Amino acid sequence: MSSFQRTAAYHTLGCKLNFAETSTIARQLTDAGYDKVGFDEKANIYVINTCSVTENADRECKLHVKRAMKANPEGLVVIVGCYAQLKPEEISQIEGVDLVLGAKEKFNILSYLDDLEKTENEGIVHSCEIEETDFFIGSYSIGDRTRAFLKVQDGCDYKCTYCTIPLARGISRSDTIENVLRNAAEIAAKDIKEIVLTGVNIGDYGKGEFGNKRHEHTFLDLISELDKVEGIERIRISSIEPNLLKDESIELVSKSRSFVPHFHIPLQSGSDDVLKKMKRRYLTKLYSDRVSKIREVMPDAAIGVDVIDGFPGETEEKFMETYNFLNELPITYLHVFTYSERENTEATAMDGVVPVAERKKRNKMLRILSEKKKMAFYQTQLGKTLPVLWEHENKDGKMFGFTENYVRVQKDFDPASVNQIEFLNLEKILSDGTVSVQSSYQNFLAKA
């Protein structure tokens, strides 16, 4: 590639961890002299960071390759991420793809751009075996967000029968506490108000690099130290496995200076029989206990739940076990995933395949339940004065923000409020599902 080509565009699919890693790749290119442009603008390089959790994510990758080619038919298209690690040769056949980088290679993107030329032939693949991906590369996102996604852990040693993530990201391994604190301090210096801790299985934090299974530190050690970082107003824990969410961590959050009362805890099924087939490491009793513990010490905490419908062997009766379990549980919202067959997973060989139409029906039922749960939770927060962090987006003259316990609110756009925390009274639930706010006396005193 000639030296005058200095623009790059990025698009991220999937989880918060991917967003953190895209930002790290973007900083590498920026430091090398590439200006960042929007993905629908003309660029010399288009980097697409892919997901492969669902079948839709695979298809979305192909759609965004077409977007890049529409923006600049001569632009170089580079594919990284989980899909790139799992199916590099398949991706290399997609029209417009020039380079495919695996889990190990994506953080050395610059070394693969020299002499890379646009071609009508299949893309070039650089992808190691996943067993070679046993090191840790720290990452965090910075950009147009008011929050940063800070990567503290990668990979997973669990063997859930539906999941390809261990095949795409390798063994569980963690950053050191020293590096995490250094990255958190860098984020604070950029006036970012909120950090979201991310990883594949962050509750497993502490395992070292290169196959060292001994926990040098625990997740509790990590959050205890992060709570001391100056300049960060909020720290939010992303998804954490219920069997790894200990009482001590819950209690620390309840008394914390910066950790907010918001937990996202994967359930996947409310049927113990299905959980066993999934090879999850808990049953519903433990899950219910974790929710009860949170509610005991933080009555107003937001509790999000991942759930999969249509897993093989999920009969109507077992699905209703899940539905009723969630309906009775004091949770806040659901992230609903419809089971899709993934190559090289145990679940694809299981009996009791649920018809696709039935999967869609169950998905709809759970989404309706999620909305009901969220609105009921929002109702309990009306009339309270809560701190709101306002985001950058200006949508039809409105701006949006979140309380510490993840209530989404809106008001008329005010550029002076962007990336600011204001104490506001929560008034009423609006037709779009957000909550209106008004200034509080506490906010008036803060400005005085």
Task: Describe these PLM feature segments.
Residues 34, 75, 98, 232-233, ...:
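A structural micro-motif
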Residues 314, 330-331:
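Contiguous mid-protein beta-loop-alpha structural module that forms a pocket-lining wall or clamp
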